[in-house]
Amino acid sequence: MKKRIGHDRLFKELLETFFGEFIELFFPQLYDAIDLEHTKFLQQEMFTDVTRGDKHRIDILVETSLKGESGIVLVHVENQASAQKDFAERMFIYFSRLYQKHRCRVVPIAIFTYPEKRNEPDRFKLLFPFMPVLDFHFLTLELNKHNWQDYIQSNNPVAAALLSKMGYQKKERVQVKLEFLRMLVRMELDPARMTLLTGFFETYLILNEEEERKLEEEIGKVDEKEAKRMIEITTSWEEKGRVKGRMEGRMEGRVEGKAEGQASLLLRQLKKKFGYL
């Protein structure tokens, strides 16, 4: 349960910081339709399933409107970190509860982030032999079906973070990390956003020592100025991770501490090679 809470927190922080970039990257038609100049993140809502005795909390709920129209539109984003047989039904229940409470249009979005490739449904139907009763649709994003190489030229920060959750082979892990660092260098974000993206990426793609050595070799092949910026980014993340790990000592701290240790290995090797920092 704690692990689920940690994953939910990471995605919530990423999407609340880069909501417009997320919608633009994966749902361009929705991006063109909604007014992102006027968005408000609503408090997470808790729904109780009395029949099953379960409680579920809405992951992300955004209040906005359509361009050129009056009235409120809600965008509901649900992150699903593990396969669930009745997930489509749960999306419908969330939708119906939100509509019942707010009485406005709701755009439901499901993000599937687990590594297994599955054909996830994007609808929930209730039918009789003699008539259809319900055909509920929702938008879906199955990250593991997206090729990471299709996004490495993007300047979208969400694309950089989510490289770690996209479809790649084990032998590509080093290259994925290298391209992630290149994207950060190119985007030149402020330190807070840089730390957020690095923390997210390092949580889901942690290189082993052999892979770190290979990454060192690859960084040694790039332009020296670019390599220096990569080292600076890694150094900043290492320092913040060490402080946070000492302060928290929780699950998140342990994950970041592990990533931080690997960053230290890479830094020691690169400092010897380039002789700075």
Located regions from the model:
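Elongated, amphipathic alpha-helical interaction scaffolds
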Residues: 1-277
